Amino acid sequence: MSAQESKQARFTDVVAEAACCRLCPAMCERTAVLSELNGSVAARIMFIGEAPGRKGADRTRKPFSGDQSGKNFDRFLASIGLSRQQIFITSAALCNPRADSGSNRKPSKTELTNCSDFLRRTIEIVDPGIVVTLGSVALEALKLIESHDLSLKESAAKVQSWDGRVLVPIYHPSPQVLASHRREAEQLRDYKVVARAIKQANHLRTKPVIQIHD
């Protein structure tokens, strides 16, 4: 078995375990969004979001698709010449957390803890050179794997080191965040930081982390 086949087999095991997980009482009727639709396990850059959206990934089974957050994410990726085929996308919570009203809500600390082993194993399998967190929840979730003292407010769009990897915390691409916390022009600048981090990583490696187009 080749190294790539071994990675794929390990990922398949994690996908199967996540699909059967019922640790969170409030999400027992939800299904984990984790499959080949998340991206290639050979990807060298991983984006981590908060959780699948009710109108987006919970319905489409593909991270950041089917809703406005997904459209924004695709636009921001394209602005630095990245495509989904080049990256792996997952989230801090693999199932969609919903309020009693049926709307999206933030995953609880317990729910994030329950999902942290899936996130840890996914990171280990994919083994990305660069991790990009989308929003404060994703950044906080990394603490459950390897401690850090970063906050999104202080660390946004600043290249960091975490668990032996390059980490770039940026804001979530949701319409709410774009309207109130990080406008489109600012987010576009944040993605340029991601692009620079990729180029810098490429300079330090014989084999490029990822090819991007200016």
Residue ranges of model-derived segments:
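Extended, histidine- and acidic-residue-enriched regions that form the cofactor-binding/catalytic faces
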Residues: P173, K207-D214
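A polyanion-binding, active-site-adjacent surface
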Residues: S2-E154, V159-Q200, L204
